[in-house]
């Protein structure tokens, strides 16, 4: 953990990246990698092999651990270079997103959900919160952490203006008239000016989405709002999804966000046999 503190003291890092690095260090310490003297190829390979996590997650942990190890080597905290660490093949599954029909089904169901959000907020129902989340999430493509941190001051001239928690990038996204109306209603009830956070801690938000989608028998998660928004932006104007998502690498959108069954960016089919 001391190495991580030194590493972070010498560079700027987004809150999400800091959280991710801390999780990686916690995993390493739990598995016996307690200090820089134990950063050895055989120990790191054993650690990565034994992690009971998906290949994509283990690949991310490997990358972050090598980053810290390289920093330790360059600053003479260890004389062992970060070499001979086995690669982890982690091919992400093809990205999926919701169609407009599915999004409208979700929105209609959310508007009818009359269950209370929390005992501590009498009178606040899910139909007051969830439709706003769906529309704003789809309109803006903001990540969960950014949605939760939205404040009334972030809404200007029909747009969201904020700094992305994960990347630290300045972000401006337009909101549809329906989204503006839903947000205005919710802001009137907010005691602290936040749009969602006053009523929805992160854990409750994730739990509600999981339960809501299971009840509707619809596959996905709240992050599919970002994918769906990006997919339909790409359909509307090819190449625009990268800007919508705030990516500096154009390949990320295609690899992780755009549902090609919706964009129809697929090869021509051969002639039918019948």
Where are the language model's segments positioned?
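Conserved tyrosine-mediated DNA breakage-rejoining catalytic core shared by Y-recombinases
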Residues: 102, 140, 145-185
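Active-site/catalytic core of tyrosine-dependent DNA strand-transfer enzymes
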Residues: 176-219, 234-237
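Phosphate-coordinating loops and pocket residues in cytosolic domains that bind phosphorylated ligands
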Residues: 41, 108, 149, 157, ...
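Basic, Lys/Arg- and aromatic-enriched nucleic-acid-binding interface segment
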Residues: 59-61, 74, 78-144, 148
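N-terminal core-binding DNA-recognition domain of tyrosine site-specific recombinases/integrases
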Residues: 5-70, 77, 92-96, 115-126, ...
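C-terminal catalytic core of tyrosine-transesterase DNA break-rejoin enzymes
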Residues: 132-135, 139, 145-146, 224-248, ...
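DNA/chromatin major-groove-contacting recognition/catalytic segments
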Residues: 171-177, 181-186, 243, 254-274
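Short, polar N-cap/turn motifs at the start of nucleic acid-interacting alpha helices
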Residues: 153-159, 219, 236-256
């Amino acid at each position: 953990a001391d190495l991580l503190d030194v590493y972070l003291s010498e560079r700027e890092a987004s809150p999400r990246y800091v959280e991710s690095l801390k999780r990686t260090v916690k995993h390493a310490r739990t598995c016996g990698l307690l200090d820089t003297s134990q950063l050895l190829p055989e120990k790191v390979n054993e650690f990565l092999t034994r992690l009971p996590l998906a290949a994509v997650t283990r690949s991310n942990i490997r990358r972050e651990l090598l980053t810290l190890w390289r920093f330790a080597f360059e600053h003479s905290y260890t004389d062992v270079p970060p070499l001979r660490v086995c690669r982890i093949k982690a091919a992400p599954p093809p990205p999926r997103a919701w169609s407009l029909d599915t999004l409208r089904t979700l929105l209609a169901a959310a508007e009818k959900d009359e269950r209370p959000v929390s005992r501590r907020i009498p009178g606040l129902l899910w139909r007051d919160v969830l439709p706003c989340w769906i529309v704003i999430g789809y309109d803006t493509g903001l990540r969960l952490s950014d949605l939760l941190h939205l404040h009334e001051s972030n809404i200007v001239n029909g747009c969201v203006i904020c700094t992305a928690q994960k990347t630290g990038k300045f972000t401006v996204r337009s909101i549809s008239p329906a989204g503006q109306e839903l947000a205005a209603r919710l802001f009137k009830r907010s005691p602290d000016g936040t749009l969602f956070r006053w009523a929805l801690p992160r854990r409750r938000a994730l739990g509600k989405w999981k339960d809501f989608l299971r009840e509707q028998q619809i596959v996905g998660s709240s992050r599919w709002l970002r994918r769906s928004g990006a997919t339909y932006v790409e359909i509307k104007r090819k190449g625009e999804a990268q800007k919508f998502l705030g990516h500096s690498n154009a390949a990320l959108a295609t690899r992780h966000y755009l549902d090609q069954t919706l964009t129809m960016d697929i090869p021509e089919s051969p002639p039918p046999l019948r």
